[in-house]
C-alpha cells in the first residue's frame, strides 16, 4: 500500500504581518480609487490621477509601517509564544478595523468639510452626546451601515488572523536578532519615507491647488493620527509657516495698523494700546448675535440665495459690511475673533486651549471691569467646545444654556430653537434695563446646524425635504426678524448697539487651497442712531469688537489689533485659517497662502470665478502675512494677550 503524506507548508513568522499589510494596502487603494472617482472632476482639474495614486501608496506604506512595525519586531523575537500570538491577532485585527472604519467614515466627513477626517474628527469625539444625537437624527442609515460593515470586517479580520498565524515555522535564536534589526531598518525607512532632514508629512505629498485632492493622497487613519500628534505642538504651531524675530514681527504688525507708537502703552504687552471711543455719550449696551453657519451664500442682499428677507430689510436700516471675512471654519474660531479680536492660528481656537482659560483678554473682561453685566446666552449646552470654561474665566458673569429654558417651544439635537433663544435674550435684556445695568451679551444661535431641526409652520420652505441647510438658514433669518420685532419695541432698544454676524460659513470647501468664497460672511450693526450704509472695505471678524466698543462709547486699554472702523481707516486685509493653511487677502484681491513647511505662495483671487491664480506678490506682503500668522501663537505662548490689569 502506498501511503501519501501531505504536509502544509510552514510560513515565515512574519507571514501574518505581510498578509495584513497586503490586505490593508488593497483596502486603502480601493477606498482612494472610490473617493477619486467620486471627486473625479476635481482630480482631473489638477491633472492629479498619477500623483494621487503613486503618492497615495507611499503614504499607505508609511501608515502601515507605523502601525505594524512594532508587532513585526516583537513577532520576530517572540513568535514561539502562544501569548504573543494572541496579542498579535488582536493587534492585526483592531489595527485593520481602525483603518477600514476611518475609510468608511470618510465620505460623510468630506461631504460636510470637503476634506479627509482631520483634527475636527477628534474634537467632535469629545462630545459624544451631541455628535451621536446629530448622527441619529440626520444620518441614521449611514451610521447603521458603518456599524454593520465595521463589525463584519472585525469578524473577517479575526478569522483571517487565525488562519495567518497557523503553521508558522520557528526561527533560530541566532537568526532572530539579525531579522529583528532588518525589521527595524525597513520599518524606520518605510515610516520616514524620506532621506531629507525631515521625515514625510502631508505637506511633502501635497501637489495641487485643491486641498481636498491633496488630502485624498493620505489615508484617513494617518490623517487623524497626524492631527492628534499636532495637538502637543500647539503653542508653537504657527512656526510651521516659518520663523521671524519677535521684534521684526511686532514692527510689521504695528506698521500694518498705522497707529502712532505713542498709542502703545506697555513694554510687557506688545500689542496693548490706549483707545478712545468715537462716541462720547453715555456708554451703550452691546449685543452680539452670533449666527451659526450663516455665510454670505445665504444672504440675499450680499448676492446669496433668497433666504434672508428679514436680514435684507434690516440691512437697509443699519451698517452692512459687504466685504467681511471670517477667520476660520469653526464656531470657536468665530467666538475667538468676535469676543477677543484674536488672530487665527493653525492651533485650536483659544477657547479650547489651557493657557487661555483665565487671564485672556475678551471684551467681556473689559466691560465687566467697567461695570457692565456680561452674559453668554445659548440654546444648547454650555460645556460644548469648552465654552463655559473659557467664558467664566474671561469676564462673562452669567451663562444661560439649555437647562435654563422653561417649557421651550421646540427642542432639537443642538438645543432649543432660535426663537426660544431670542425670547430668553429679550427677557434678560428687558430685566437688566429695568435694573439700570449696562450689559454686554453674546447670543449664539444653533438651529442652522446639521441635522437642521426647527419648528414647523414658521417659514415657507425653500425646498423639500424640510430638514435642509437652506431651509434652516431661512428659519435662522426668520428668528432674527422675530427678535428685532421685540427689540425695537423694548425699553433697551435706544441704549443698545447690536451686531448680527456669522461665526463661519456652512460646508466650507472647494477646489482651491483656501476656498475664499466660503469665508465671506454677513456683518450688520444696528441700533438707534446708526446711520444706514453699505461698507465695501475689506475687513475681518477681528475688526468687529474694536468697532463695537467705539460705537458704544467704551474707551480703554486692550491688546486687540483689529481696526476701529468708525474712523477713517482701511484695514485692507483679511486673515483666513483653513485647517493648517492660512491665507491673507488684501483689498486688491492679492492673496498670500501659507502651508506647513512650505514657502509662502502668492495668488490673485478672482471673485467672479471664485478661483485663485498663481501670482508673484511682493516679499513685503509675504512678511506681513507671516508676521500676523506668528503673532497669535507668540502672544498665547507667552501669555501676553491681556489688558495688563489684575482682576
From Swiss-Prot:
GO terms for molecular function: transferase activity. One of its GO terms (cellular component) is membrane. It comes from Haemophilus influenzae (strain ATCC 51907 / DSM 11121 / KW20 / Rd). It is found in: Cell membrane. This is Uncharacterized protein HI_1246. Its main location: membrane. The chain crosses the membrane at residues 14-38, 61-78, 90-110, 140-158, 178-195. Pfam families: Sulfatase. It is a multi-pass membrane protein. Disulfide bonds: none annotated. Keywords: Cell membrane, Membrane, Transmembrane, Transmembrane helix.
Amino acid at each position: 500500500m502506498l501511503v501519501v503524506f501531505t504536509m502544509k507548508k510552514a510560513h515565515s513568522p512574519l507571514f501574518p504581518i505581510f498578509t495584513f499589510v497586503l490586505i490593508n494596502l488593497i483596502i486603502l487603494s480601493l477606498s482612494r480609487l472610490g473617493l477619486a472617482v467620486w471627486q473625479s472632476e476635481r482630480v482631473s482639474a489638477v491633472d492629479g490621477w498619477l500623483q494621487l495614486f503613486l503618492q497615495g501608496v507611499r503614504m499607505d506604506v508609511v501608515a502601515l509601517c507605523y502601525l505594524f512595525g512594532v508587532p513585526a519586531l516583537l513577532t520576530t523575537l517572540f513568535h514561539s509564544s502562544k501569548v504573543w500570538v494572541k496579542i498579535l491577532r488582536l493587534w492585526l485585527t483592531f489595527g485593520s478595523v481602525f483603518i477600514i472604519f476611518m475609510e468608511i467614515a470618510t465620505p460623510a466627513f468630506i461631504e460636510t468639510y470637503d476634506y479627509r477626517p482631520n483634527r475636527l474628527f477628534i474634537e467632535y469625539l469629545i462630545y459624544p452626546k451631541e455628535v451621536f444625537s446629530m448622527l441619529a437624527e440626520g444620518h441614521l442609515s449611514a451610521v447603521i451601515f458603518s456599524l454593520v460593515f465595521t463589525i463584519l470586517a472585525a469578524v473577517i479580520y479575526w478569522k483571517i488572523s487565525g488562519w495567518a498565524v497557523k503553521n508558522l515555522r520557528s526561527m533560530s535564536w541566532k537568526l532572530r536578532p539579525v531579522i529583528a534589526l532588518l525589521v527595524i531598518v525597513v520599518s524606520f525607512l518605510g515610516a520616514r519615507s524620506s532621506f531629507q532632514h525631515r521625515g514625510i508629512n502631508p505637506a511633502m505629498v501635497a501637489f495641487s491647488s485643491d486641498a481636498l485632492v491633496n488630502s485624498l493622497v493620505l489615508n484617513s487613519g494617518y490623517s487623524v493620527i497626524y492631527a492628534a500628534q499636532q495637538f502637543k505642538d500647539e503653542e508653537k504651531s504657527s512656526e510651521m509657516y516659518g520663523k521671524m524675530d519677535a521684534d521684526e514681527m511686532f514692527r510689521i504688525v504695528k506698521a500694518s495698523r498705522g497707529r502712532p507708537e505713542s498709542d502703545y502703552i506697555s513694554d510687557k504687552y506688545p500689542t496693548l494700546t490706549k483707545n478712545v471711543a468715537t462716541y462720547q455719550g453715555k456708554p451703550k449696551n452691546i449685543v452680539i448675535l452670533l449666527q451659526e453657519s450663516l455665510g454670505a451664500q445665504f444672504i440675499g442682499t450680499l448676492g446669496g440665495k433668497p433666504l434672508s428677507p428679514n436680514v435684507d430689510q434690516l440691512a437697509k436700516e443699519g451698517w452692512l459690511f459687504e466685504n467681511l471675512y471670517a477667520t476660520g471654519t469653526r464656531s470657536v474660531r468665530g467666538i475667538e475673533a468676535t469676543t477677543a479680536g484674536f488672530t487665527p492660528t493653525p492651533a485650536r481656537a483659544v477657547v479650547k486651549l489651557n493657557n487661555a482659560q483665565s487671564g485672556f483678554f475678551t471684551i467681556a473682561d473689559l466691560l465687566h471691569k467697567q461695570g457692565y453685566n456680561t452674559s453668554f446666552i445659548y440654546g444648547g449646552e454650555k460645556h460644548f467646545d469648552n465654552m463655559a470654561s473659557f467664558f467664566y474665566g474671561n469676564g462673562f458673569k452669567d451663562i444661560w444654556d439649555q437647562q435654563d429654558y422653561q417649557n421651550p417651544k421646540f427642542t432639537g439635537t443642538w438645543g432649543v430653537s432660535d426663537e426660544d433663544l431670542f425670547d430668553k435674550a429679550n427677557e434678560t435684556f428687558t430685566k437688566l434695563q429695568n435694573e439700570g445695568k449696562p450689559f454686554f451679551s453674546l447670543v449664539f444661535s444653533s438651529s442652522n446646524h446639521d441635522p437642521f431641526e426647527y419648528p414647523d409652520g414658521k417659514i415657507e420652505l425653500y425646498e423639500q425635504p424640510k430638514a435642509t441647510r437652506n431651509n434652516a438658514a431661512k428659519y435662522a433669518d426668520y428668528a432674527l426678524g422675530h427678535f428685532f420685532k421685540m427689540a425695537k419695541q423694548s425699553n433697551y432698544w435706544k441704549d443698545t448697539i447690536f451686531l448680527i454676524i456669522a461665526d463661519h460659513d456652512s460646508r466650507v470647501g472647494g477646489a482651491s487651497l483656501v476656498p475664499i468664497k466660503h469665508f465671506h460672511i454677513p456683518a450688520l450693526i444696528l441700533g438707534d442712531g446708526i446711520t444706514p450704509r453699505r461698507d465695501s472695505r475689506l475687513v475681518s471678524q477681528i475688526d468687529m469688537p474694536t468697532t463695537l466698543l467705539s460705537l458704544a462709547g467704551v474707551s480703554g486699554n486692550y491688546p486687540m489689533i483689529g481696526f476701529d472702523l468708525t474712523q477713517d481707516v482701511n484695514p485692507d486685509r483679511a486673515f483666513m485659517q483653513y485647517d493648517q493653511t492660512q491665507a491673507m487677502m488684501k483689498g486688491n484681491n492679492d492673496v498670500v497662502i501659507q502651508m506647513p513647511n512650505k514657502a509662502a505662495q502668492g495668488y490673485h483671487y478672482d471673485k467672479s470665478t471664485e478661483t485663485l491664480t498663481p501670482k508673484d506678490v511682493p516679499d513685503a506682503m509675504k512678511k506681513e502675512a507671516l508676521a500676523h500668522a506668528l503673532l497669535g501663537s507668540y502672544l498665547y505662548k507667552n501669555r501676553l494677550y491681556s489688558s495688563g490689569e489684575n482682576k
